[in-house]
Amino acid sequence: MELNQLKSVPKARNHKTKTLGRGHGSGLGKTSGRGQKGQKARKSGLTRPGFEGGQTPLYRRLPKFGNARKGFLKQEWVVLNLNKIAKLKLDKINRASLIEKQVISAKSQLPIKLIGHTKLEKPLHFEVHKVSKQALKAVENANGSVKLLEK
């Protein structure tokens, strides 16, 4: 079948467009079905949605609410607390080990931040993007290490 062989379904194309402004005999001459004068008879006659005839419209009378625009550039982090990490019984803590232990989602692409000041019993080795001063001090006191990754 080719494009030039296509035919419309019978009775599917009954609607014909109105021919406007072509004399009284057409039934839609002179004012083209718009009535006499007035705003709706003009070419740009319809008002915009929400227009209330010059009265302050409802969407401007009601107060703004919510902070939808506040902090949209703010950096989000996956926050790890030392006291929770100490309970996991891991030696090396990185994204792969945290996903394996289901601490973070496998889909999460957020950078990881280490916080907390819990005293650690054994040395732990971290690979994170950011670390607080207290957490760094606690890890180093336990002879552990923190490797900072780039975002």
UniProtKB/Swiss-Prot annotation:
Residues 22-36 have a biased composition (Gly residues). Keywords: Ribonucleoprotein, Ribosomal protein, RNA-binding, rRNA-binding. GO terms for molecular function: rRNA binding; structural constituent of ribosome. GO terms for biological process: translation. Residues 10-21 have a biased composition (Basic residues). It comes from the Bacteria. Disulfide bonds: none annotated. Pfam families: Ribosomal_L27A. Residues 1-58 are annotated as: Disordered. Part of the 50S ribosomal subunit. Belongs to the universal ribosomal protein uL15 family. HAMAP family: Ribosomal_uL15. Binds to the 23S rRNA. This is Large ribosomal subunit protein uL15. It comes from Mycoplasma pneumoniae (strain ATCC 29342 / M129 / Subtype 1).
